[in-house]
Amino acid sequence: MEQSILDLLRAGGFILYVRHGEAIVGEDQPYFNFQYCYTQRNLSDYGRREAVYYGQMLRYWQIPINSPIIASPLCRTIETAQLAFPTMYIQIDPFWFEINKLGGDISAREQQQILKNVQSQLEKTPPFGTNQVIIAHSFPNGIGLGKIPNMGTVIVKPKGEGNGYEIVKQLPLTDLATLGNSLYK
């Protein structure tokens, strides 16, 4: 039986893993500091508008969101969370910065450990009737949740701790406007 993604999200029980809004061109400084945004790539003006729109769409569709919103400690993810969810508490979780390491030169063992930790985070079921939002970073192609566009969302269905998770759908930001027409089989 087909159900709309919107109906599923309104019922709750999902993790919405979201990549931050568009950032300025360039790279984080080699020895950046989480406390100093000027050492990092930050949101562009367009990225700020994307974040505001994202939050507006979730409120428009009346998708229940659990508080706190979880964000990586980089300024671009924190600002994305603040703009999308201005009235909600934001919890900074340093673990989600680890996703950035997956695209770098790390050992297979370190990569496996990061992915194992991602799995354990994505297995956690949110409180009944709500969805958990995590705002972090894209993964490299073919690793973890894969490449995610700016403000793209991977809808994850946790199966409980130790039982894995299912990727329900990946939605680019533009698909939020037509969420009621998107089906899950």
Protein language model features and the residues they cover:
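Generic beta-sheet signal
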Residues: 13-15, 130-136
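Feature of secretome-associated and extracellular-like proteins
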Residues: 126-128
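A polyampholytic, Gly/Pro-enriched intrinsically disordered region
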Residues: 108-123, 179-185
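Active-site-proximal alpha-helix that buttresses catalytic centers in soluble enzyme cores
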Residues: 2-106, 146-185
